[in-house]
Amino acid sequence: MIAALLLAAAAASAVDAERAFARDAQKIGMWSAFRKYADRDAVMFTPQAVWARDFLRDRKDPPKSISWRPAQSYVSCDARTAINTGPWFTPDGKLAGYFTTVWQRSGGSWHWVYDGGGPNKVAPAAGPPKVYRASCARRAPGAPIIPPPPLTKSQARTTPEDNGRGEAADGTLGWDWKVGKKGDRHFRVYQWNGSRYTLVLNNLVPAP
């Protein structure tokens, strides 16, 4: 266990962290792996937004885990925030859809803060993930994302709002999400290219 924790801490990139996460899902159990890599304030969807710490707290691992692999990774200039996406598969290896995970590095370790996904009929070709790094040219003013209304203390303790946002510390990568009343979800990622922000990921997840 100590060796596994040291390996997670030593992950050089969010792609490495994603791969370690996926390996651990097979080794120690799916929900155990989710708990291991989750940030304290990580968010999941069921389909409404829930705190991962509450959803995962007493959840037992299934007999067999799903599997997944990163296909694209969008990284901030300072390489401390990244958003990975790629296909995920049922325990018997059938394509089930795509995942999107937001990762942040703190204290030498990577933890995920957002985990979502949606249906997909075609998986990207297997191979090394494509990594897209934000520009480090010029100071990024902050991604063009509308912040959600502030939560009351009671709301913050119980459940996430139906929308949220986040941004890399250097401002070169930002994301936001919103859940509809029926459980549909919209997730966007903006990346700084040196002169402006471009929309690099736009997930429209239908209601279940």
Label for each model-derived stretch:
Residues 2-31, 35-36, 121-159, 165-169:
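Short, low-complexity N-terminal intrinsically disordered segments enriched in polar/charged residues
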Residues 19-24, 41-45, 89:
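Second-shell loop/turn segments in exported
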Residues 21, 68-70, 81-85, 98-103, ...:
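Short, structured motif recognition centered on aromatic/hydrophobic residues
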Residues 27-48, 52-55:
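Short, well-ordered alpha-helical segments enriched in acidic and aromatic residues
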Residues 30-33, 45-46, 69-73, 113-114:
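Surface-exposed patches in mature extracellular/periplasmic domains of secreted proteins
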Residues 96-129, 185, 190-207:
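Short beta-strand edge/turn micro-motifs at domain boundaries
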